[in-house]
């Protein structure tokens, strides 16, 4: 007999995370590595656990994540978004608390492209009047 699995996809910046929740002990595995090994920053690991804290389900589910693209911050945000979406499948009553915490909203900010003639996206060389 197979256990119930809940899936969710999260995105942030250039990162895309495919998340599976399985009832368990709260172990988080990212790209077949433990989360402490994969994401070295403790504050980013707190970001990943936010959906569980908001819904009072800390330690209730094992999380299996496959994440590609972006850096540590983008991937952590994508994992958080995916976990929040997967928790909606667990219990639709979580929607109100997750929405209030802003965890279901896709953060649409992306890196602005560099423009020709400028040094960066908006930084120009110093203007000389004469």
Curated annotation (Swiss-Prot):
Q: Which residue stretches belong to region Disordered?
A: 106-130
Q: What processes does the entry annotate via GO biological process terms?
A: translation
Instruction: Supply the alphabetized keyword list.
Output: Ribonucleoprotein, Ribosomal protein
Which Gene3D superfamilies does this chain map to? 3.30.230.10
Q: Quote a single Gene Ontology cellular component term.
A: cytosolic small ribosomal subunit
Q: Keyword ATP-binding on this protein?
A: no
**Xref: InterPro entries:** Ribosomal_Su5_D2-typ_SF, Ribosomal_uS9, Ribosomal_uS9_bac/plastid, Ribosomal_uS9_CS, Ribsml_uS5_D2-typ_fold_subgr
Q: Name one Pfam family in it.
A: Ribosomal_S9
Keyword field contains Transferase: no
Question: Care to name a GO molecular-function term for this sequence?
Answer: RNA binding
Q: Where is the composition biased (Basic residues)?
A: 111-130
* Family to which this protein belongs: Belongs to the universal ribosomal protein uS9 family.
Protein name stated in the entry: Small ribosomal subunit protein uS9
Q: Which gene encodes it?
A: rpsI
